[in-house]
Amino acid sequence: EPDGTLTVTDKRSMQVYRRLLTFEDCADIGDGWNFGPAANDQAIYSTGSRTTLALVSSGPNKATFRLRTVMEVPVEFHFERMTRSDDFSGMVIDSLVTLRAGAGWVEVDTTVHNDVRDHRLRVLFPSGAQAETCLMDSPFDVVERPVRLREDNHRYREQEVETRPQQTFTAVFDERRGLA
């Protein structure tokens, strides 16, 4: 898509997935272990950023494209003002998107050239699935975790956050739709 996102149609189920590969950047004022959201922070999305598309390789069995997105994000968080900097830097995000003949999936390998501080970058893959849990990789395991935070989360000293640790995949699905 012109905004740097992907639209994918699953030819087996004819389900269409839109706005895949949207990047979201927000302030992170936590420590090295825990994400700490900043009050009154405004998330920045890659859909408003400069994006270029280039064919990297093409053959009878696979094609690879490079999506390069340059997100203008604040260079740091000013703790004395409790706000993000007014100075911005271009964070380059390169995603190699590969399609293989006969494969039922799209491969994405993303590299981020990050020179900014005090922020969290995450990638969004809206599945449209009505799921209560998701599957994630963990060292030597696959674990099932709830999609939403507990209702009593606000009562705990160290509150859970919506994001969970994982390295290679997350899967979310219901009876009709799903992504991994």
Where are these regions (language model features)?
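Short, acidic/polar linear motifs in exposed loop/turn regions
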Residues: 114-116
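Catalytic and substrate-binding regions of extracellular carbohydrate-active enzymes
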Residues: 1-111, 123, 142-153
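Polysaccharide-binding surfaces and accessory modules of carbohydrate-active proteins
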Residues: 125-180
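Active-site-proximal binding-pocket segments
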Residues: 119-121
